[in-house]
């Protein structure tokens, strides 16, 4: 029975039993705590937790799942897979144990003709929780499974919970006995290689309390509603019904291995190490294709890094199998052909899937070739010294120089029988990050001695008051000039000022610093920039305009209100654009960087390939609809875990403290961890106008936008431009695009006609040159200056035409042009002249130096260019001389 039919029979069985068929959820849910969907019940969690009312009392689905915790074990055994399909039936307070058990038994044991799978009931074993007599009684007394094939297990095996307080309950697992050739007797307790688990029935009947482990937590009591959550492994059922030993030999996976056999010339099942690589390719190609289809792009962290790792393992496995050319396209194509009947997106979106996968392959092949040589040298050196550990410095060099991720180095080391000093590697990585931070600080502070800032940090952080006020009274704690503390600064001096408190925003999180002033009696100081030291100390870079600023002064620190308003519009606009991107493109459009300043924003995000015009328009519409909705903007401080559980967006790789600030715009529309300043409501952002979109690196795109008055000014210019075009073209503005397109087409046709006319005029001169041909021995020679301004393809075409007019007579044509002070030249020698020993390439070498140039080519045609027009006559004489020397006596 084919896998597609297994899926279909499952769904049909439960639809007939009153269940609503629900499509598989995306592998990517908008949940910061879940890397990938890894179970069939994930999309139904809000129903099980009582957070939402289910629209149906019972449901069935086949959910695509990805688990990557044991990715390094994939291929080594036949039991590990990263991608699998979980078929399930679910009841939300409707039926319970009896119906769940009977539904499963009916589907498994009914004949194929009756819509079932036709499993032999005598080979089915079940397990139940230790004291779940209800389930035991149903299996034994109502279904008819003898007690000898029912085993009781404890909480670790047969009691389910989500790992946190919430629904929980006993479960009953269904196993199939493959026979004595696969292991010893005794049921699942004795041998889970022989007895394969195919279905797990979870009876959610209790509420879990706190606990410290999977099998040690408090059960608080019964739930008000009892639910059912089951999961049947589609691939496991497939290999049992197809009579093969494991998932890798089923109809959906074996074709990928077959393609790898074809490309490598090796056979699956012959050599263990090769088999590992075949299985890695087969598993990872399926997973990678499904992840890309759901919007994941290769990246350096989070989901993107998992995808990158999968693709790179495919590339390396193919190379180790001996594939002599890139193979990713071939593997992805097989995945499409086998799985698209169940997942049509693999077909409809194949172009993008292929582009992403092949792009990563192309980039990694360069890294793999160069990095592998360094690794092999390091491994040989370690073995030669009698040691077994590759040093952290060597692993760091692989990462730093060749981009080798540490997991690849670990994998290669294990294959070579070696280990890696991971602690040493991570120490060097930490040192590199610290150096980068120090360098950044040094650049911001003109490479000053940071000791002075450390002394000030030890006295405590700057109090930032700018969230609540734009003017604050502050004490001048220190003045710094060229890295040294100074007691006073006078008019005209540029210094750095440290205050005990400040309303001026220090550059951070993509938002540039506030502008403002420091004032006092007879004192006016312009604040040009504000930077942070160690995220705690505000360093104000200022120019003293009037008076004298002294350490210990009390000043009024004031933000430029217009500047701040524009900056908050830009920053809040960035959040709106981020939310709109994710709404249009999906949750994988994750922030990779940003810049916000008054009236303008720039946002970098992870994405593969250019956005379409329709996507850009949709993003702009979504953002402006949110602006028009006048959403309230709320900020609050909470702990990091709670913020993430609420769905707040956090940047991968960013270090957050225990407490974080959350900026929420319109409830669920946008919620991000952010320390920046923002508007009070979304309508204060004003219009959002996207300016364009471009690539800024591998897998990273950038959008730019104007907001507020800058957006209106931009649109006013665009409107004026359109009005001008409308007036010039004498058509209504809505007809301008069509009229411009028509004019461009007319111009294209005219240019083509002009080019044809010009080419014909050039070729018309061919007859004149033929008439002027000189006879040198048996050869007809044209050695002359080309018509004025003729060069490039025109010159080549003219020379070719002249040569052709001589027919079978031996002929040499050499024309030199004069175009903008350059001397293009082309020499053509026909076959008859070549038989006399003449070659175009030899001729250009002879006369090239006369015009300060060089050229090259083959015997029939050669060309080049010189820079000395005064040497044209001498060069032509040289051509005549070379031909005469070669054939003059013949």
From Swiss-Prot:
GO molecular function: alanine-tRNA ligase activity; aminoacyl-tRNA deacylase activity; ATP binding; tRNA binding; zinc ion binding
Pfam families: DHHA1 (PF02272), tRNA-synt_2c (PF01411), tRNA_SAD (PF07973)
Enzyme class: ligase
Gene3D superfamilies, per the entry: 2.40.30.130, 3.10.310.40, 3.30.54.20, 6.10.250.550, Bira Bifunctional Protein, Domain 2 (3.30.930.10), Threonyl-trna Synthetase, Chain A, domain 2 (3.30.980.10)
Cofactor detail note: Binds 1 zinc ion per subunit.
Cofactor: Zn(2+)
Main location class: cytoplasm
InterPro entries: aa-tRNA-synth_II/BPL/LPL (IPR045864), Ala-tRNA-lgiase_IIc (IPR002318), Ala-tRNA-ligase_IIc_anticod-bd (IPR018162), Ala-tRNA-synth_IIc_core (IPR018165), Ala-tRNA-synth_IIc_N (IPR018164), Ala-tRNA_ligase (IPR050058), Ala_tRNA_ligase_euk/bac (IPR023033), DHHA1_dom (IPR003156)
Binding-site positions, Zn(2+): 571, 575, 674, 678
Reactions it catalyzes: tRNA(Ala) + L-alanine + ATP = L-alanyl-tRNA(Ala) + AMP + diphosphate
Function: Catalyzes the attachment of alanine to tRNA(Ala) in a two-step reaction: alanine is first activated by ATP to form Ala-AMP and then transferred to the acceptor end of tRNA(Ala). Also edits incorrectly charged Ser-tRNA(Ala) and Gly-tRNA(Ala) via its editing domain.
Family the entry assigns: Belongs to the class-II aminoacyl-tRNA synthetase family.
Name assigned to this protein: Alanine--tRNA ligase
Source lineage: Bacteria, Bacillati, Actinomycetota, Actinomycetes, Mycobacteriales
Annotated gene: alaS
């Amino acid at each position: 029975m084919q896998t597609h039919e297994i899926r279909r029979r499952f769904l049909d069985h439960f639809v007939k039993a009153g269940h609503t068929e629900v499509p598989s959820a995306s592998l990517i849910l908008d949940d910061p705590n879940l890397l990938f969907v890894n179970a069939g019940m994930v999309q139904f969690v809000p129903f099980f937790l009582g957070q939402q009312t289910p629209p149906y009392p019972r449901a069935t689905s086949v959910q695509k799942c990805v688990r990557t915790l044991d990715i390094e074990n994939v291929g080594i055994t036949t039991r590990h897979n990263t991608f699998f399909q979980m078929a399930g039936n679910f009841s939300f307070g409707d039926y319970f144990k009896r119906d769940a058990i009977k539904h499963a038994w009916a589907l498994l044991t009914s004949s194929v003709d009756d819509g079932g799978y036709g499993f032999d009931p005598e080979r089915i074993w079940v397990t139940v929780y230790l004291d779940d007599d209800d389930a035991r009684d149903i299996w034994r007394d109502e279904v008819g499974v003898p007690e000898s094939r029912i085993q009781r297990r404890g909480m670790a095996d047969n009691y389910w919970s989500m790992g946190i307080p919430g629904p929980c309950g006993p479960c009953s697992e269904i196993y199939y006995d493959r026979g004595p050739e696969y292991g010893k007797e005794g049921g699942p307790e004795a041998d889970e290689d022989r007895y394969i688990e195919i279905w797990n029935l979870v009876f959610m009947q209790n509420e879990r309390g706190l606990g410290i482990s999977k099998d040690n937590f408090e059960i608080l009591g019964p739930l008000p509603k009892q639910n059912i959550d089951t999961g049947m492994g589609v691939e496991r059922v497939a290999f049992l019904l197809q009579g093969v030993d494991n998932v890798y030999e089923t109809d959906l996976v074996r074709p990928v291995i077959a393609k790898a056999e074809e490309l490598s010339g090796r056979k699956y099942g012959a050599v263990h190490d090769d088999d590992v690589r075949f299985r890695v390719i087969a598993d990872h190609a399926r997973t990678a294709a499904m992840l890309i289809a759901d919007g994941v792009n290769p990246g350096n962290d989070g989901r993107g890094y998992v995808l990158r790792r999968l693709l790179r393992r495919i590339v390396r496995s193919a190379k180790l199998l001996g594939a002599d050319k890139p193979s990713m396209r071939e593997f992805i194509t097989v995945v499409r052909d086998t799985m698209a009947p169940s997942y049509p997106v693999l077909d409809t979106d194949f172009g993008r899937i292929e582009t992403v996968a092949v792009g990563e392959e192309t980039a990694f092949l360069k890294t793999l070739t160069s990095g592998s040589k360094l690794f092999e040298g390091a491994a040989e050196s370690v073995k030669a010294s009698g040691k077994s550990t590759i040093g952290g410095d060597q692993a760091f060099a692989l990462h730093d120089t060749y981009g080798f991720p540490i997991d690849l180095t670990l994998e290669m080391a294990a294959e070579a029988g070696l280990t890696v000093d991971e602690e040493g590697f991570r120490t060097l990585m930490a040192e590199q990050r610290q150096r980068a931070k120090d360098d950044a600080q040094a650049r911001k502070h003109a490479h000053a001695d940071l000791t002075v800032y450390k002394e000030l940090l030890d006295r405590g952080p700057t109090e930032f008051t700018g969230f609540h006020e734009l003017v604050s009274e502050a004490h001048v704690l220190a003045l710094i000039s060229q890295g040294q503390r100074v007691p006073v600064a006078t008019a005209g001096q540029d210094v750095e000022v440290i205050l005990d408190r400040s309303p001026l925003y220090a550059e951070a999180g993509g938002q540039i610093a506030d502008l403002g002033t420091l004032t006092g009696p007879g004192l006016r100081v312009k604040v040009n920039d504000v930077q942070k030291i160690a995220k705690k100390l505000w360093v104000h870079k200022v120019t003293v305009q009037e008076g004298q600023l002294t350490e210990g002064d009390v000043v009024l620190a004031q933000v430029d209100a217009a500047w701040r308003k524009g900056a908050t519009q830009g920053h809040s606009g960035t959040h709106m654009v981020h939310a709109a991107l994710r709404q249009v493109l999906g949750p994988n459009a994750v922030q990779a960087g940003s810049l916000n300043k008054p009236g303008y924003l720039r946002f970098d995000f992870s994405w593969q390939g250019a956005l379409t015009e329709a996507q850009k328009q949709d993003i702009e519409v979504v953002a402006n609809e949110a602006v028009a909705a006048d959403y309230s903007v709320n900020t609050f401080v909470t702990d990091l875990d709670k913020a993430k559980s609420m769905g707040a967006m956090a940047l991968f790789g960013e270090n957050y403290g225990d407490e974080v600030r959350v900026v929420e715009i319109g409830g669920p529309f946008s919620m991000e961890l952010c320390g920046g300043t923002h508007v009070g409501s979304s309508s204060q952002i004003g219009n959002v106008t996207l300016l364009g979109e471009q690539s800024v690196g591998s897998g990273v795109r950038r959008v730019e936008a104007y907001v507020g008055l800058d957006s209106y000014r931009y649109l006013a210019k665009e409107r004026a431009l359109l009005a001008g075009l409308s007036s010039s073209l004498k058509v209504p503005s809505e007809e301008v695009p069509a009229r411009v397109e028509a004019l461009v087409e007319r111009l294209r046709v005219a240019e083509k006609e002009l080019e044809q006319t010009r080419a014909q005029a050039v070729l018309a001169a061919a007859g004149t040159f033929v008439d002027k041909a000189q006879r040198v021995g048996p050869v007809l020679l044209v050695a002359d200056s080309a018509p004025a301004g003729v060069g490039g393809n025109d010159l080549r075409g003219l020379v070719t035409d002249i040569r052709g007019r001589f027919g079978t007579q031996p002929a040499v044509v050499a024309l030199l042009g004069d175009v903008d002070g350059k001397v293009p030249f082309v020499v053509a020698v026909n076959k008859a002249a070549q038989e006399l020993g003449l070659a175009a390439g030899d001729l250009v070498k002879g006369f090239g130096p006369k015009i300060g140039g060089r050229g090259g080519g083959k015997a029939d045609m050669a060309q080049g260019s010189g820079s000395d027009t005064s040497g044209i006559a001498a060069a032509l004489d040289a051509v005549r001389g070379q031909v005469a020397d070669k054939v003059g006596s013949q």
